Amino acid sequence: MKKIIFIILTIAFAISNLKAQNSIAKNLDEVIVSANRAQTEGNITNVQIISLEEIENAPVQTIEDLLEYAINVDVRQRGGQGVQADISMRGGTFEQVLIMLNGIKLNDPQTGHHTMDLPVSLEQIERIEIITGGASRIFGNYAYTGAINIITKSEMANSVSISGGENAFKSGGINYHTSTGNLKHNISVNQKESDGYIEGMDYKIKNYYYQAKTNIDGINALFNAGYTIKEFGAFSFYTPKYPNQFEKTKTTFASLQLRKEGKITLDNKISWRKHNDEFILFRENPSWYHNFHETNVFSMDMNVIQKTKTGTNVIGMEIRTDNIISNVLGNDLESPIEIDTNNFYYKGASRTTTNLFIEKNINLNDLAISAGIMMNIDSEYGNEYFPGIDIAYNFSNNIKLFTSYNKSMRTPNYTELYYSSPTNQGNINLKSEHSTNQELGLKWNGNSHKTSFTYYKREGENMIDWVLINGDSIWRTQNISQLTTTGYELNSRIDINKMLNTNLSISTLNINYAVNESDTTSEGFQSAYVLDHLKSNLSFTASQNISKKIRIDWRASRQDREGGYIDFESGEDVEYLPFWLISTRLSCKVFNNSTIFLEINNLFDNEYVDFGNIPQPGRWMRAGVKITI
């Protein structure tokens, strides 16, 4: 391990020029990010950005696969290709990451398994901002280990894309942009489907997305609306005992953002998200053990931002109401609600959360400070306070030192509280999770590289997990009283030709390396999520320019996961084994407005699992064309 770190540091630092001003990356404080409620320029906290260039050229087809490009982001998939994925950060769980679309929160109160049911595809995305570390003082609930903000394009090129591949994979999409006066419209429709890489892993996904943007009398307005449908075979998704499962989800989403800039800036957001989940445990006999859930989330976020000589003052308030009706989750309803002629909702639950925010941002030459506190008022869990502070100091135009201290929290979701089945049992007495987060890091932009190193520590209390006690046959939710997680992250983006003063076809190399360690192990029980984090994650991505029109992009990654599982067929304990994955994409520009591509994932057909008893895809080849009109 020490040898790996030494090699990476040597490559990143030894050949670069400390005083050089012409960085290959953007200036340290150039990008507007989601790192504070004021949405001001600058990058005080540890924020990563996946750029448009990376999005367009990565050998991936989904947002979930793209997030693997961020350092210390763990993407555990069940069906692949965006069917269902759990996103976690820094050794946390998939319930502890906030997912946003243009700053609108989209986490699902039923279960985090559905949070990535997003109505957008890669074609609509401008960039992705990843805020690592606890961020409840900025975003409130769910931002326990970090937050991800997906930013869509203001103006999309009119285009048509078609692709196909192994396992009867088919995909098609249309993107259309037009303007009426100063009102800009983006409309996108796309669909993909496959028979699956094994029996029971078939899927069909449809996305519909609309965005309108305008400025009226100095007020910037952004309207988003989307609808997505997923139908998929859920082979062993939730239990290997009954592998032939099936699930169908529908997500409807709409939001309106109004922002008026000035010495006093008013920033307001209102949103609604509806999610329907239909789960069939026995696909061949859908009339038996058929679960229905419907969630509705209404949210309003208001901020007043005052500009000062040295920064900004911010006060804000968020009100969020979560509702669920179900035939499984919640308390008994006064009267059943009809779903169809044969099924009814018998249970339901709701809660309202109000968050009050105060934030102070100070910029004094090379010193930047962002401090604030969030008061969480929850109808079920009472009132709590979560303070935090982020500090950054620029030693030069190219070197920045940053540190932070933040308190974070997450309340249990409805599945953790109420779910009951032959193999799982929720717990209505669960407490909220809490954590204290500390980090220290350095960012260095040189002439031929952009490098960052971060050390972090998270002290967690009342961590929520699904646990199987040895000798028991039922997974149960419970709070783990104490769990401390520490780790470090290294990222270096290198311009090889500048570094070596050559003209090689491989122009850029990006290296990510992360290590996570927890002070608790699963002795005497199995942990479904909390203790099955990545121990280490190493990845290399490279861009190879064959000619002006032909480009090859490569990605190689190695994952080593903590914990293990019981193999269903043998009944034996199996440790998660480390594995390598290599993927590549060949793209060629033709006729000045079109691109054809060939993409291969898992090039060497390695066998691996993200979750026990759910095999992941082997080698998968796809090819396609995108025509810009």
Which sequence ranges carry the predicted segments?
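Short, acidic, small-residue-rich periplasmic hinge/interaction motif at the N-terminus
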Residues: 21-56, 94, 450
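Extracytoplasmic beta-strand/coil segments of soluble accessory domains associated
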Residues: 64, 68-104, 108
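Short acidic/polar hinge/loop motifs at secondary-structure boundaries
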Residues: 86, 105-132, 150-151
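Short strand-turn segments of transmembrane beta-barrel domains in outer membranes
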Residues: 147, 152-178, 188-201, 244
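Flexible loop and strand-edge segments within Gram-negative outer membrane beta-barrel domains
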Residues: 194-201, 205, 220-297
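Outer-membrane beta-barrel signature, preferentially recognizing the C-terminal barrel domain
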Residues: 238-262, 349, 400, 407-461, ...
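Gram-negative outer-membrane beta-barrel transporters
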Residues: 363-368, 457-459, 479-565
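C-terminal beta-signal and adjacent terminal beta-strands/loops
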Residues: 461, 507, 558-566, 584-629
